[in-house]
């Protein structure tokens, strides 16, 4: 990434440039399920989050009069080849040894592609959360999917872990306010 930013800084300034960087909402870390927007301080306690935050800073350092920098912080991607609802439904009637009270965030692959196009079409020059409207805990989401499918609910056995975790109700309002609409606003239904 350093070589890329160095090369881009040396390019001719006359030609406008639009950069789009895909980051992760995981940079927010454990916010205990609190509503979280782009203004929230990033969690640099976990090494992965620290690397992601440094990458965002490096890309943002390229911003200038001739360079627009758009950063999208993505939720967990689902869609073709990554059927998250089916994975969650596989827990039906079983025991899940994870913390079902964490609030993850999601985005469909189709909306990722559309958002990148939107960034280029509208010359976006800011940071946006690219997540759909689903703001359920892992257990709530799994329960809802099981109920819709007529399957028995999973039993959750919460274990403490030192793994990297996202536990935040990540807001997508800033992106919606500039006119982006989601084709898949929810992972449910």
Locate each region found by the language model.
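Conserved sequence/active-site signature of Rossmann-fold short-chain dehydrogenase/reductase
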Residues: 27, 77-79, 112
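Alpha-helical substrate-binding/gating segment
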Residues: 86-95, 101-128
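Mid/C-terminal beta-alpha module of Rossmann-like enzyme folds, strongest
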Residues: 113-166, 171
């Amino acid at each position: 990434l350093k070589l890329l930013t160095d090369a881009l800084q040396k390019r001719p300034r006359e030609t406008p440039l639009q950069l789009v960087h895909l980051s992760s909402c995981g940079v927010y870390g454990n916010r205990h399920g609190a509503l979280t927007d782009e203004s929230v301080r990033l969690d640099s306690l976990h090494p992965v989050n620290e690397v992601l935050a440094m990458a965002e800073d490096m890309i943002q350092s390229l911003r200038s009069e001739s360079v627009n920098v758009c950063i999208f912080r993505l939720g967990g991607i689902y869609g073709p080849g990554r059927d998250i609802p089916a994975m969650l439904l596989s827990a039906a009637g079983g025991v899940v040894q994870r913390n079902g009270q964490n609030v993850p965030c999601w985005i469909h692959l189709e909306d990722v592609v559309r958002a990148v196009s939107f960034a280029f079409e509208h010359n976006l020059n800011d940071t946006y959360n690219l997540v759909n409207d689903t703001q359920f805990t892992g257990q709530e989401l799994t329960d809802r999917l099981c109920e819709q499918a007529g399957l028995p609910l999973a039993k959750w056995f919460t274990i403490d872990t030192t793994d990297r975790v996202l536990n935040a109700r990540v807001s997508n309002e800033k992106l919606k306010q500039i006119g982006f609409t989601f084709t898949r606003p929810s992972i449910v239904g």
